[in-house]
């Protein structure tokens, strides 16, 4: 009774399609994909900035010696 079979998953998927419709699910999938893509891009941009700072590429005003 507690097992999840392929038949149960197909029934749930059919109910979801009937409830929301294919257009709504397609839109939801596109929005989710865009959100994941944006998140990955932000993470890559942050990593690139951290690597740039770690390599010593600092602005000139931070490298000058003040007495």
Swiss-Prot record:
Q: Is Oxidoreductase included in the keywords of this UniProt record?
A: no
Name any one Pfam family assigned in the record: TatA_B_E
| Residues that span the membrane, as ranges | 1-21
Location comes to: Cell inner membrane
Main location (coarse class): membrane
Name any one GO molecular function.
protein transmembrane transporter activity
Q: Which domain of life is it from?
A: Bacteria
Instruction: Give the residue ranges for region: Disordered.
Output: 45-67
Membrane topology field: Single-pass membrane protein
One of the record's GO cellular component terms: TAT protein transport complex
Q: What keywords is this UniProt entry annotated with?
A: Cell inner membrane, Cell membrane, Membrane, Protein transport, Translocation, Transmembrane, Transmembrane helix, Transport
In the UniProt record, the signal sequence range is none
Which GO biological-process labels does this protein carry?
A: protein transport by the Tat complex
Family recorded in the similarity comment:
Belongs to the TatA/E family. TatE subfamily.
Q: What's this chain's function?
A: Part of the twin-arginine translocation (Tat) system that transports large folded proteins containing a characteristic twin-arginine motif in their signal peptide across membranes. TatE shares overlapping functions with TatA.
What is the official name of this protein in its record?
Probable Sec-independent protein translocase protein TatE
Q: Which organism is it from?
A: Escherichia fergusonii (strain ATCC 35469 / DSM 13698 / CCUG 18766 / IAM 14443 / JCM 21226 / LMG 7866 / NBRC 102419 / NCTC 12128 / CDC 0568-73)
